[in-house]
């Protein structure tokens, strides 16, 4: 406890008045730049206008005022927290034209995802996975699952997150995990394999 207090005291003593603590590692740097500047770390570092001058931020983060599009939403969330689109990733960016379409995600940390996304739970039931996120002025439905909620085996769910791949701006399961998780979903969650899924096996 004394060591933690001394560390905190050092931050306070050497802190900048009216400043903001930025980060302690690359992950936190990515999160802060994405939230505050609305861009990825790579985009920020590629800037040609970084001359050391300081300017005030005058706009609210997107999580406060709403995301411009699903593409915008995922470009920022990709920098902030770990997730995968469980199914139908090729249809995600078409979901904006169909407000009845849920986007199914497995997230590593539900509280972190909610904080960065602005997701609002549809029902107060703690077991309900449905959330709404304001995208381009419309509520888009997301089903948010975690390794701990029993939707998939916890160790398998974590492995799916650990082995995720970036495809067309979205994190998705590896090809092998995509196949088996879809079959598991069809048999364990839906009790039957739909015609759409059957052609994949």
Give the ranges of each region predicted by the language model:
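Conserved catalytic core of two-metal-ion nucleotidyltransferases
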Residues: 121-160
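Catalytic domains that recognize anionic headgroups
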Residues: 68, 87-90, 103, 117-136
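Non-catalytic terminal and connector segments of soluble metabolic enzymes
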Residues: 1-60
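Hydrophobic alpha-helical interaction segments
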Residues: 186-201
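Core nucleotide-handling region used for phosphoryl-transfer chemistry
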Residues: 140, 150-181, 185, 195
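Short, conserved charged micro-motifs
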Residues: 2, 111-118
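Helical scaffold of the NTase/Pol beta-like nucleotidyltransferase catalytic core
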Residues: 41-85
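Active-site nucleotide-donor binding segment shared across nucleotidyl transfer reactions
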Residues: 68-113
